[in-house]
Amino acid sequence: MTKGKLLTTPSRLLKLVLPLSTVDHNTDRKDVAPLALLVHPQQPLSYLERLIQAELPPPDPQDSKSTTRSVTFRAMEAKDDEIKPRKKADTEGGGGSDGSVQSYSGAGREGEGKDEGEFVRWSPSTEIGDFIRDAARAKEFEVEIEGSPGVIKVAVPSFNDRTYYLRQRLRRTSRKISKLAAIKEECDKAAHRGAQRIALAGCGGLIGYWYIVYRLTFETDLGWDVMEPVTYLVGLSTLIGGYMWFLWHNREVSYRSALNITVSARQNKLYQAKGFSLQDWEGYLEEANAMRREIKAVASEYDVDWNETQDEGGDEKVTKALRDERKNNNGTKNKSKEGEEDDEDD
């Protein structure tokens, strides 16, 4: 093993594999076993430096006064990424090609062509994730250890490498969502059809009530003198009963509220009959959206366009379900913020 590797793990940590070698005058010794280190992208390079130093033997006192070997991290600075002042101000707000803006690419080790540029030493206080993002413009970066015969070349992970496990998990979760979405859609349609039938039955009941009142009023001996208080009491009783029903269910007095209650009750029965778990459904949606946010964050770091539809299984039902879940969460957050602002104003 002559080169190092920087790999991703299912736990979202980075696994750095280095072929550490020290000065050895014995020619019959086998290759040194590579060293694996787990680091977090938000940790600084100085933390990684200390991990490497802990695995190295102390330097020769005759060659160095320091008790530890220095470790330097260098990434390639492309020639066309030299920072220059703008030649002409852009009055329209558009970006110019000669401005002090550096270009980034998420190709990493998958990049084509030959890297051109010089390696630049990075400060130990830099976060590992920022260092990798900049180093991804080339195929590899260098790790130089004091006293080693040469630098260690480490292959830079691309965007696909960094998000491999996240995208695999997103695909598995999307398949689960797709199966549940088919069941949920069937149950929801059946519940809405049932609610519509109940509404039509109510309309038929009102028409029947009107017809009975008409017959008893104009075609019998009862007349309007008897039917007037009867219709008044029936209407008032219906109004009071409906109002009490809305109070009992703690809902706004409206047709939509009554329809939602009817649909929800029917949905719950159908969900139980079909073995659909609403908690699992919401959990899968939250998990998929969380992974989607992480992947988009990495895509933003690498400045690449991520085709999320492909990793979501290409199912329009899954995409719509995730989009609706994000809208609901955003609406809930906005309402909570408005409530907090109102409390502060009071």
Curated annotation (Swiss-Prot):
Keyword terms, alphabetized: Calcium, Calcium channel, Calcium transport, Ion channel, Ion transport, Membrane, Metal-binding, Mitochondrion, Mitochondrion inner membrane, Transmembrane, Transmembrane helix, Transport
Mitochondrial intermembrane side, ranges: 217-226
Job of this protein: Highly selective calcium channel localized to the inner mitochondrial membrane, which mediates calcium uptake into the mitochondrial matrix. Mitochondrial calcium homeostasis plays key roles in cellular physiology and regulates ATP production, cytoplasmic calcium signals and activation of cell death pathways. Sufficient to operate as a pore-forming channel without the need of calcium-sensor or auxiliary subunit.
Chief localisation class: mitochondrion
Protein's GO biological process: calcium import into the mitochondrion; mitochondrial calcium ion homeostasis; protein homotetramerization
Renumbered residue ranges of the record's region Disordered: 55-120, 306-346
Subunit relationships: Homotetramer, assembles in a dimer or dimers configuration with two interfaces.
Its membrane topology: Multi-pass membrane protein
Mitochondrial matrix topological intervals: 1-195, 249-346
Residue numbers binding Ca(2+): 228
Note on domains (UniProt): The selectivity filter, in which calcium ions are arranged in single file, is composed of two acidic rings separated by one helical turn along the central axis of the channel pore.
Any single Gene Ontology cellular-component annotation: uniplex complex
Stretches that traverse the bilayer: 196-216, 227-248
Lineage of source species: Eukaryota, Fungi, Dikarya, Ascomycota, Pezizomycotina
Subcellular location: Mitochondrion inner membrane
Gene Ontology molecular functions: calcium channel activity; identical protein binding; metal ion binding; uniporter activity
Basic and acidic residues bias spans: 76-91, 109-119, 315-328
Highest taxon in the source lineage: Eukaryota
The name this protein goes by in its record: Calcium uniporter protein, mitochondrial
Motif Selectivity filter, residue range(s) on this chain: 224-232
Family as reported in the entry's similarity comment: Belongs to the MCU (TC 1.A.77) family.
Catalytic activity: Ca(2+)(in) = Ca(2+)(out)
Xref: PANTHER family: CALCIUM UNIPORTER PROTEIN, MITOCHONDRIAL
